[in-house]
């Protein structure tokens, strides 16, 4: 099987809402501190906590074909391990994302297969990067404005990548002012072209630092280049737990 086909399994949104003209927010120090804090909080509702495990069902539609896969996913900080559960032909395969590097691991292979930056822009690999985006950690706030999405008051962030390790150079990100969760994101390549659009739903809740907060239940990812391509990620069985660093040890995973 070609590696680009395998990428459709990678884990780590469907109608755009009404967008109204944005109102500029002054970029003074107090406003910037508020914007940064809100961005950090929005990340907590998508998995950027001390340790988390979940199951994800993925349905991907591309070129008239539909693929369905289920994965068990472990996440801690910027590290993520996806273990294929179904269909049976891919069960046991693994994908490791560590410090923005990515590897594919298959039973029977003596060495992991590294996924190049170019390959990360293809197929499901780009969707995996969208699912695991660390907005507060990997991006700088160039500007933020008052806006609305689906009639909900938001801040619209214009984010710029801090370095070239991340897949997307720029992101436009709508964050709910009241609920402190990301609702929509547009992802741009280095050339300035919009590549993907993501929509987020939050029907789960988790406890973070003793406080209940909404947690992502579904992501719908649309391809701006190929209008018919669509990926839906549904999250289940979410558990906050301690995850050992050894879970992301590449040498141990290929044994």
Set out the residue ranges of the language-model regions.
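Hydrophobic residues embedded in beta-strands of well-ordered beta-sheets
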Residues: 79-80, 102, 112, 182
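Flexible, processing/modification-adjacent segments and terminal tails
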Residues: 23-40, 47-50, 57, 67, ...
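Positively charged n-region of N-terminal signal peptides that target proteins for export
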Residues: 1-4
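N-terminal, post-signal-peptide region of Sec/Tat-exported proteins
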Residues: 50-81, 85-87, 180
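Short, surface-exposed charged micro-motifs
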Residues: 70-72, 93-94, 172-174, 199
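Sec/Tat signal peptide C-region and signal peptidase I cleavage site
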Residues: 15-22
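Bacterial N-terminal signal peptides
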Residues: 6-15
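Gly/Pro-enriched, hydrophobic low-complexity segments
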Residues: 152-248
